[in-house]
C-alpha cells in the first residue's frame, strides 16, 4: 500500500471518528446548540416605578424591543451574559439604560450561540423622545406614539411599525438595514453607508431626507411634501401618493420618473444606481 493511500485512510478515519463523536455529544444535548456555548446567560428584571416620558439607551450587542405591558407596569427585562449588569434609572423625566460589562478581557473569548436582548415593557403607548444607540443589536418598536426618535446602529437592524411621531424620526446605520412600516412623522431623516432602507406606507408631513453610499432605497405608497434622496451606487425604487416636481440625476444608471409638474420637490441623485419612481393612484 502506498504512503498516500495510508494517509488517506488515516484522514478518513479521523473524519469518521469526529462525526461519530459530534453526533454522540449533540444527542446527549438533545441537539440544542445553545448548550455548546461557553458563556452563561441570565435574566435580570428592573422595575421602574418613577414616571418618565423620554428614554435613552446606549448599548452594544443586545437587541432592543419596546413592548406594551399587559399589566400597566413599567419594567426592563435584560437577558445577557451573567457578568453584564444594567444601570437603569429615571432622571429628569428620562429613563436611562446602560450596560456595565464586568468581564475581563479573556472572558470575551469563547463560543456563544445566545442572543442578548433588552425588553422595555411600557405602561402606555405614548412617549416623549426616544434615543437609542446600538452596535450589532437590533432596535424594534411597534404601535407607539412618540415625540421624536433618534436611532443609530452599526450592523444591527432598525424596525418600526405603526408609529406616530410628532417630530423628527432619525435613523443612522453603517451596514445595518432600516425597515419602516405604517409610520407618520414630521420629518424622516436617515443616513447610512451600505445599509438598505425599506419604507412602506410612511408619511412625513414636511420632508424625507435619505442618504446612502451603496445601500438601496425602496419605498411603497409613501409621501412627503418635499423629498431628497442621495446615494452613490445604490438603486432608488418606489411609489408615491401624490404628484411631485421631479429632479432626477444619475451618471450611468437609468431614470424612470413621472413627468408631473405640480406638487412638492422630489430630488433624487445617484452616481451609478438606477432611479424608478411612479405615482400610486
Q: How would you label these PLM feature ranges?
A:
Residues 2-134, 140-153, 159-173, 179-191, ...:
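Acidic (Asp/Glu) and glycine-rich low-complexity loops/linkers
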Residues 180, 199, 219-220:
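Structural signature of tandem-repeat unit edges
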Residues 195:
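Acidic (E/D-rich), amphipathic helical modules within compact regulatory domains
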Amino acid at each position: 500500500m502506498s504512503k498516500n493511500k495510508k494517509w488517506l485512510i488515516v484522514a478518513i478515519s479521523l473524519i469518521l471518528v469526529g462525526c461519530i463523536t459530534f453526533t454522540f455529544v449533540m444527542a446527549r444535548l438533545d441537539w440544542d446548540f445553545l448548550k455548546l456555548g461557553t458563556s452563561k446567560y441570565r435574566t435580570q428584571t428592573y422595575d421602574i416605578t418613577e414616571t418618565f416620558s423620554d428614554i435613552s439607551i446606549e448599548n452594544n450587542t443586545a437587541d432592543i424591543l419596546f413592548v406594551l405591558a399587559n399589566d400597566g407596569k413599567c419594567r426592563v427585562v435584560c437577558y445577557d451574559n451573567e457578568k453584564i449588569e444594567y444601570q437603569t434609572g429615571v432622571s429628569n423625566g428620562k429613563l436611562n439604560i446602560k450596560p456595565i460589562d464586568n468581564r475581563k478581557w479573556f472572558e470575551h473569548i469563547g463560543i456563544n450561540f445566545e442572543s442578548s436582548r433588552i425588553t422595555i415593557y411600557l405602561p402606555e403607548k405614548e412617549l416623549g423622545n426616544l434615543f437609542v444607540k446600538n452596535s450589532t443589536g437590533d432596535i424594534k418598536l411597534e404601535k407607539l406614539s412618540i415625540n421624536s426618535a433618534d436611532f443609530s446602529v452599526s450592523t444591527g437592524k432598525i424596525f418600526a411599525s405603526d408609529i406616530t411621531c410628532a417630530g423628527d424620526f432619525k435613523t443612522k446605520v453603517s451596514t445595518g438595514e432600516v425597515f419602516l412600516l405604517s409610520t407618520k412623522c414630521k420629518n424622516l431623516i436617515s443616513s447610512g453607508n451600505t445599509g438598505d432602507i425599506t419604507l412602506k406606507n410612511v408619511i412625513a408631513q414636511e420632508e424625507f431626507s435619505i442618504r446612502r453610499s451603496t445601500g438601496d432605497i425602496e419605498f411603497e405608497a409613501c409621501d412627503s411634501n418635499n423629498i431628497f434622496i442621495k446615494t452613490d451606487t445604490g438603486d432608488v425604487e418606489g411609489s408615491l401618493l401624490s404628484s411631485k416636481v421631479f429632479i432626477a440625476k444619475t451618471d450611468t444608471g437609468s431614470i424612470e420618473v413621472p413627468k408631473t409638474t405640480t406638487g412638492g420637490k422630489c430630488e433624487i441623485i445617484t452616481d451609478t444606481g438606477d432611479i424608478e419612481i411612479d405615482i400610486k393612484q
